[in-house]
Every structure is written in structure tokens, then in C-alpha cells.
Amino acid sequence: VQDEEEKLYIYAQTMDGRTRYGIVACAHSEDYMNGIIKKHELTRKDKEDDRMIHVNITNANVEPVFFAYPAHKEIDQMVDNIVKNEKPIYDFVAKEDGFGHTFWVIEDEATIKRIEEIFEKEIPALYVADGHHRTAAAARVGQERRAGNPNHNGNEEYNYFMAVIFPDNQLKIIDYNRVVKDLNGLSEEEFLAKLNDTFVVEKVGTEIYKPSKLHEFSMY
């Protein structure tokens, strides 16, 4: 369902008893190319290419990327006021994982303009929390379509992609776990010896161990 007028939206995600509130908006590909939208992962070209094909075929952003921004008191207050006083347009719990999803429309033009002004003048950067390949692909699609449009002015829809932007004080960094199912023909001792070629491997006991510093990993 497409609104007749441009709006911003508030998205609340509830999981494990915690709720975080983000703003659904469009991000500009130039902000990514110019480093205002900051990444912390290297991306693979084949994955970017795959996502570009999807965007070009559907001509849509079907899933928002997840950005974080330094929390801003005035934005927090505006979001809180809408959440407490306005009726959400959608409110449901997903059967698959039990997560709650709630959406509000920001209708007031003055509020929309003020939020845009704060992000333009007072928020120095956005940070990609999830969606590095989708962000890179969206920026590349914008560049390609710009190159093919002699009348490009920067306001075309292909310059933008959908994002949900959460304040950093509502985020929780959780474990990023991966399972090694196959040692590729190596014994456990040989596998650990191979790791020693690149890492310093130390035994730390039999209890759960969480990394405590940069470039440290735990393995079981």
C-alpha cells in the first residue's frame, strides 16, 4: 500500500522483552558514497551483483537496511510523544519467532521537517548495523541509473533506498556465532595446528568464555 504523500514512519521491534524504536526513511546513495553512511565490513562483489539484479528486476527495495545513529534527545522525545498518543497503523506478532512489530505514521509536517533538519545538521553520521551488501548494491544501482540519465538531478527515486534507523542507546550487541561442521578431512589436532598458522590459540578452560578485547575469538 503506497501513501499518497511522503511520510516518515516509526517502527517498534519487540523481542526477548525489549523494545527498540526506529525511524523508517529513505537514505541517499550519495551519503554512502561520500562516507556519511559508514560501513564496518568488507563486501563481496558477487553478493552485491546478486542484490543489484534483484533491485533492477523488481524496481524496489523490498527489505530495509538497518542503520544506527548517535541518540538525540529531541528525536527521542518526538518519537515517544507519537508512540504514546497516536494509534499504530500495524501491530502484530510474527508466528515464526514471536517478535512484535508495530508501525506509526508521522503525519505532522513540522515534525517531519524537524527530524530531517536534525539528521542533516546535528547527526554527523549513520552506521550500517545490518545490510552492508544491500546498501552497497543500492548505491551502485543509483550510480548506474544516473549514468544512463542525461537529465539526472539527484531527486530521482533511484537515488534513494529504504532504511530503518535506530538510536545507539537502544541497541544491544549479541553474540555472532558460527558452527564448523566439517574439518575438511583434518583431525582436531591438525585443525588447531592450521589455526596456529594465522592465530595465537590458547586453551582457557572448560567454562563458557566470552571475548574481552579486540581481535579475540572464543571457540568450542
Residue ranges and their predicted role:
Residues 1-220:
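Surface-exposed, charge/polar-rich loops and edge strands
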